[in-house]
């Protein structure tokens, strides 16, 4: 029997929470967990070079199947030698299934058992995405970690609808597993859905765990529900995933949500948040968010974050970065993007150390107090 493409190794459990320290072994290298994954939607993390991402400690990045299918097309990427060669990234890559993007086109799509009919958001042409097609595209892209095609229903959808949805997602997951051409080179994750309904999350997890995926994602969160709701769902969903498999919380990137996810046993996170807010001149700092384009920073010659040792904070001032952003200079966006990504990657590095030292709850409390978060969102341990 061949070795699975990806393997999770548990290194240490936190004594006081559900947090765990581990590593994920993939065909393109091993990365430590818990880990935040920068998002490179179109085979690039906006304005960042691969060298800069490595420099700041990004052990794995995410690319988007839907967008790469539309442009430049999976066949072209395959011809280039796969996504790693195409974008000159020699470390692990995770691709999503395209499902979230298709389902967010709510006024332009129709769901059937076979798959989803929708209109291309670029030119309005009719397209069809099935579980098999989503896997086929990802096989051609050559990512290390692939996602099953799933439906992501709105968090406030009715119980009856969500029940039908998770049952269909389970059938789609089974079809995707059968269609997967490279299980020895690419690991496929199942995605647990169920909105805020505990029994439906349990059913979804049970179905998927019975299929023995090498890893599992928790989907359908960070879609507008409160932090308390998200934590409530994680409290009963994460334990449903086997301990020997990686657990990935999709679309989460706020610092407090990362820490609270880790406390509940999550290993992997991704989000466009750090680069998206960076393009608007908003920076993550140890004191909370800083909107550097605001007038109060015009003559502020301090770094973005005086406690940060990233390249940006060692070399540039708030005043200079504000000037660049106010003048629509791309370099300003590069600087804020670099800093925000570094901030989250460094946060996760510190979280991993806190798990190693068995003081994650103390770390969380100190971080939240300095950042200004409401600690009431936390579960008591």
Swiss-Prot record:
One of its GO terms (molecular function) is metal ion binding. Pathway: tRNA modification; tRNA-queuosine biosynthesis. InterPro entries: ArchSynthase1/Queuine_TRR, TGT, TGT-like_sf, tRNA_ribo_trans-like. SUPFAM superfamilies: tRNA-guanine transglycosylase (SSF51713). Zn(2+) binds at residues 308, 310, 313, 339. Its EC number is 2.4.2.29. The active site is at 96 (proton acceptor), 270 (nucleophile). GO terms for cellular component: cytosol. HAMAP family: Q_tRNA_Tgt. Catalyzes the base-exchange of a guanine (G) residue with the queuine precursor 7-aminomethyl-7-deazaguanine (PreQ1) at position 34 (anticodon wobble position) in tRNAs with GU(N) anticodons (tRNA-Asp, -Asn, -His and -Tyr). Catalysis occurs through a double-displacement mechanism. The nucleophile active site attacks the C1' of nucleotide 34 to detach the guanine base from the RNA, forming a covalent enzyme-RNA intermediate. The proton acceptor active site deprotonates the incoming PreQ1, allowing a nucleophilic attack on the C1' of the ribose to form the product. Homodimer. Within each dimer, one monomer is responsible for RNA recognition and catalysis, while the other monomer binds to the replacement base PreQ1. This is Queuine tRNA-ribosyltransferase. It comes from Enterococcus faecalis (strain ATCC 700802 / V583). The gene is tgt.
């Amino acid at each position: 029997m061949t070795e699975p493409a990806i393997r999770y190794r548990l290194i240490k459990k936190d004594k006081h929470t559900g947090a765990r320290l581990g590593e994920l072994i993939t065909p393109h290298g091993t990365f430590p967990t818990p880990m935040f994954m920068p998002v490179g939607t179109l085979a690039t993390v906006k304005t960042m070079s691969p060298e800069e991402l490595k420099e700041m400690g990004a052990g794995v990045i995410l690319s988007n199947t839907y967008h790469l299918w539309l442009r430049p097309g999976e066949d072209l990427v395959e011809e280039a030698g796969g996504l790693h060669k195409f974008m000159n990234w020699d470390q692990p890559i995770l691709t999503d299934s395209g499902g979230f993007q298709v389902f967010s086109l709510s006024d332009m799509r129709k769901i059937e058992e076979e798959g989803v009919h929708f209109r291309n958001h670029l030119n309005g042409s009719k397209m069809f995405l099935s579980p098999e097609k989503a896997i086929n595209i990802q096989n051609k892209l050559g990512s290390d970690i692939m996602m099953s095609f799933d439906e992501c229903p709105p968090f406030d959808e009715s119980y009856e609808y969500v029940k039908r949805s998770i049952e269909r997602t389970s059938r789609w997951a089974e079809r995707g597993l059968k269609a997967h051409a490279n299980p020895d080179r690419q690991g496929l994750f199942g995605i647990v859905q169920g909105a805020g309904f505990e029994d439906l999350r349990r059913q979804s997890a049970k179905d998927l765990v019975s299929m023995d995926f090498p890893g599992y994602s928790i989907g359908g969160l960070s879609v507008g529900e409160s932090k308390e709701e998200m934590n409530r769902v994680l409290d009963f969903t994460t334990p449903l995933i086997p301990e020997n498999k990686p657990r990935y919380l999709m679309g989460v990137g706020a610092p407090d949500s990362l820490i609270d996810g880790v406390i509940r046993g999550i290993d992997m996170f991704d989000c466009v948040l750090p680069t998206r807010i960076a393009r608007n001149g908003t920076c993550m700092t140890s004191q909370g968010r800083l909107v550097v384009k605001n007038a109060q920073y015009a003559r502020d010659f301090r770094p973005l974050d005086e406690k940060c040792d990233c390249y940006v904070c060692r070399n540039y001032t708030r005043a200079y970065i504000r000037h660049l952003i106010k003048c629509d200079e791309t370099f300003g966006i590069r600087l804020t993007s670099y800093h925000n990504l570094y901030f989250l990657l460094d946060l996760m590095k510190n979280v991993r150390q806190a798990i190693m030292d068995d003081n994650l709850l103390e770390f969380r409390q100190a971080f939240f107090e300095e950042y200004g978060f409401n600690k009431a969102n936390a579960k008591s341990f």
